[in-house]
UniProtKB/Swiss-Prot annotation:
<dbReference type="GO" id="GO:0006633">
    <property type="term" value="P:fatty acid biosynthetic process"/>
</dbReference>
<dbReference type="GO" id="GO:0042593">
    <property type="term" value="P:glucose homeostasis"/>
</dbReference>
<feature type="binding site">
    <location>
        <begin position="359"/>
        <end position="364"/>
    </location>
    <ligand>
        <name>ATP</name>
    </ligand>
</feature>
<feature type="transit peptide" description="Mitochondrion">
    <location>
        <begin position="1"/>
        <end position="46"/>
    </location>
</feature>
<dbReference type="InterPro" id="IPR045851">
    <property type="entry name" value="AMP-bd_C_sf"/>
</dbReference>
<feature type="binding site">
    <location>
        <begin position="221"/>
        <end position="229"/>
    </location>
    <ligand>
        <name>ATP</name>
    </ligand>
</feature>
<dbReference type="InterPro" id="IPR025110">
    <property type="entry name" value="AMP-bd_C"/>
</dbReference>
<dbReference type="GO" id="GO:0015645">
    <property type="term" value="F:fatty acid ligase activity"/>
</dbReference>
<dbReference type="GO" id="GO:0005524">
    <property type="term" value="F:ATP binding"/>
</dbReference>
<dbReference type="GO" id="GO:0006637">
    <property type="term" value="P:acyl-CoA metabolic process"/>
</dbReference>
<dbReference type="InterPro" id="IPR042099">
    <property type="entry name" value="ANL_N_sf"/>
</dbReference>
<keyword id="KW-0436">Ligase</keyword>
<protein>
    <recommendedName>
        <fullName>Acyl-coenzyme A synthetase ACSM2A, mitochondrial</fullName>
        <ecNumber>6.2.1.2</ecNumber>
        <ecNumber>6.2.1.25</ecNumber>
    </recommendedName>
</protein>
<keyword id="KW-0547">Nucleotide-binding</keyword>
<feature type="binding site">
    <location>
        <position position="557"/>
    </location>
    <ligand>
        <name>ATP</name>
    </ligand>
</feature>
<feature type="binding site">
    <location>
        <position position="472"/>
    </location>
    <ligand>
        <name>substrate</name>
    </ligand>
</feature>
<dbReference type="GO" id="GO:0004321">
    <property type="term" value="F:fatty-acyl-CoA synthase activity"/>
</dbReference>
């Protein structure tokens, strides 16, 4: 662990490996080392190198047993594990996956669970066994699940009651799928029961010695055209990067952090698992079956939560309540990510709670990219400076770095040194990976401005992705769902401004002639319900406008940009392209 405590600013030479997993860097070396000139150990595994370290400290009496995972369901049921218990329980999970299920190193495992303790155990079990985990939201429908299982050639899926029927509907169309593992109190034909197997499994598992650059996770990330891409992360781009980022929020070993996130988001693995545990801190989890601001406020008032991470919509919805009725005696650090934090949200939260909100920025492919750390000055409307291991710049269309105050594309320098934290690439799609590199930089697909102090201001997305309440939604996915309805001849989906969600999905629809006389209000509800039934409900168009035709290029391509520009201009708000 000595090297792991010294990796702040650590980056990796692409393709370089060390002969030892131990890297010793003294404080004098740390001061002199520049970005991109450090190496990483050849072997790294978050479970054995980090989690088990804290467990061993507890066993040796060098650390008082304290909560590592504190889970509540809001109905009186609570669970609390220290690091020793978490280590043993996750070793049981690894034995279930590699033993009872017969999965082997490198196999891909889809994980579709709500915020239950088993999600954390399954992820750690995959890490220990060298399996590639692929988290997904429980809001997925059968078509979403089918696509992910077929594209990834997943050998197993771990799921709960929420999606069991959706999985069974398509399982026969997935030839690679061998194991269906159910996290439930009940049994189901064709499924192994995870809880039963976990209770029977040994608490001792020999952790696989995984390579730092070895594949650890795949996240399906939405694009503006086509279906979601498979973004692959390594053990170092997730685990080591999380260790380097840990503490930027002000979190310490004795603290409790609550990350309000969907388990299908990369935010959950980073901020509700790796970053707090890298520091030996506790992650707090509320089942929160549905988003309820009153439940969140009561929880903050009742539990010793020191740090809270959530998308800006969390704070906006909390501010809609009467905060004078609540006291947060322990809360000190409030952090946000997922979309831009409006200055008025920051000001209102500060006025009513006395607390700041520190903004951060990143994406599935890069993790935490910019942030306002605990020691930094907050500039309303700015998302902070670059993460320690990243050289983030604003570049022009040729890849040249632009001077402060100039708008351009946000990029991370990946040549000649590829920094730790950058994902490995899009699986089976090298052309798409290469297309996101301009000159020496990885393009994040967003526009921004960098000021004289190195703070970045987000100006908008350079593509068509819709960011609604932190959910990234590709327009083509919604368009495909709408086109399945007989009333729809053509459709174009864009973002539309919303005071609470930031953006919502809006669909422009050209109707079939036989539906032109239908009641527009009733047809709108029918189309919305149709989308909810065939894909994840958060993607449904909250706004639908019926039109006679759509703007197109001379080659017949629908011009979403024209529709989007008009939509945002009508609202009086700007959304940079």
């Amino acid at each position: 662990m000595h090297w792991l405590r010294k990796v702040q600013g650590l980056c990796t030479l692409w393709g370089t490996q060390m002969s030892s997993r131990t890297l010793y860097i003294n404080s004098r070396q740390l001061v002199s080392l520049q970005w991109g000139h450090q190496e990483v150990p050849a072997k790294f595994n978050f479970a054995s190198d980090v989690l088990d370290h804290w467990a061993d400290m507890e066993k040796a009496g060098k650390r008082l047993p304290s909560p590592a995972l504190w889970w509540v369901n809001g109905k009186g049921k609570e669970l609390m594990w220290n690091f020793r218990e978490l280590s043993e329980n996750s070793q049981q999970a690894a034995n279930v996956l590699s033993g009872a299920c017969g999965l082997q190193r490198g196999d891909r495992v889809a994980v579709v669970l709500p915020r239950v303790p088993e999600w954390w155990l399954v992820i750690l079990g995959c890490i220990r066994a060298g399996l590639i985990f692929m988290p997904g939201t429980i809001q997925m429908k059968s078509t979403d699940i089918l696509y992910r299982l077929q594209m990834s050639k997943a050998k197993a899926i771990v799921a709960g009651d929420e999606v069991i029927q959706e999985v069974d509907t398509v399982a026969s169309e997935c030839p690679s799928l061998r194991i269906k593992l159910l996290v439930s109190e009940k049994s189901c034909d064709g499924w192994l029961n995870f809880k039963k197997l976990l209770n029977e499994a040994s608490t001792t598992h020999h952790c696989v010695e995984t390579g730092s650059q070895e594949a650890s996770a795949i996240y399906f990330t939405s694009g503006t055209s086509g279906l979601p891409k498979m973004a692959e992360h390594s053990y170092s781009s997730l685990g080591l990067k999380a260790k380097m980022d840990a503490g930027w929020t002000g979190l310490q070993a004795s603290d409790i952090m609550w990350t309000i996130s969907d388990t299908g988001w990369i935010l959950n693995i980073l901020c509700s698992l790796m970053e707090p545990w890298a520091l030996g801190a506790c992650t707090f989890v509320h089942l929160l079956p549905k988003f309820d601001p009153l439940v969140i406020l009561k929880t903050l008032s009742s539990y010793p939560i020191k740090s809270m991470m959530g998308a800006p919509i969390v704070y906006r919805m909390l501010l809609q309540q009467d905060l004078s009725s609540y006291k947060f005696p322990h809360l000190q650090n409030c952090v946000t990510v997922g979309e831009s934090l409006l200055p008025e949200t920051l000001e209102n939260w500060r006025a009513q709670t006395g607390l700041d909100i520190r903004e951060s920025y990143g994406q599935t492919e890069t993790g935490l990219t910019c942030m306002v750390s605990k020691t930094m000055k907050i500039k309303p409307g700015y998302m902070g400076t670059a993460a320690s291991c990243y050289d983030v710049q604003i570049i022009d269309d040729k890849g040249n770095v632009l001077p402060p105050g100039t708008e351009g594309d946000i990029g991370i320098r990946v040549k000649p040194i590829r920094p730790i934290g950058i994902f490995s690439g899009y699986v089976d799609n090298p052309d798409k990976t290469a297309a996101n590199i301009r000159g020496d930089f990885w393009l994040l697909g967003d526009r921004g401005i960098k000021d004289e102090d190195g703070y970045f201001q987000f100006m908008g997305r350079a593509n068509d992705i819709i960011n609604s309440s932190g959910y990234r939604i590709g327009p083509s996915e919604v368009e495909n769902a709408l086109m399945e309805h007989p009333a729809v001849v053509e459709t174009a989906v864009i973002s539309s401004p919303d005071p609470v969600r930031g953006e919502v999905v809006k669909a422009f629809v050209v109707l079939a002639s036989q539906f032109l006389s239908h009641d527009p209000e009733q047809l709108t509800k029918e189309l919305q319900q149709h989308v909810k039934s065939v894909t994840a409900p958060y993607k449904y168009p909250r706004k639908i406008e019926f039109v006679l035709n759509l703007p197109k290029t001379v080659t017949g391509k629908i011009q979403r940009a024209k529709l989007r520009d008009k939509e945002w201009k009508m609202s009086g708000k700007a959304r940079a392209q």
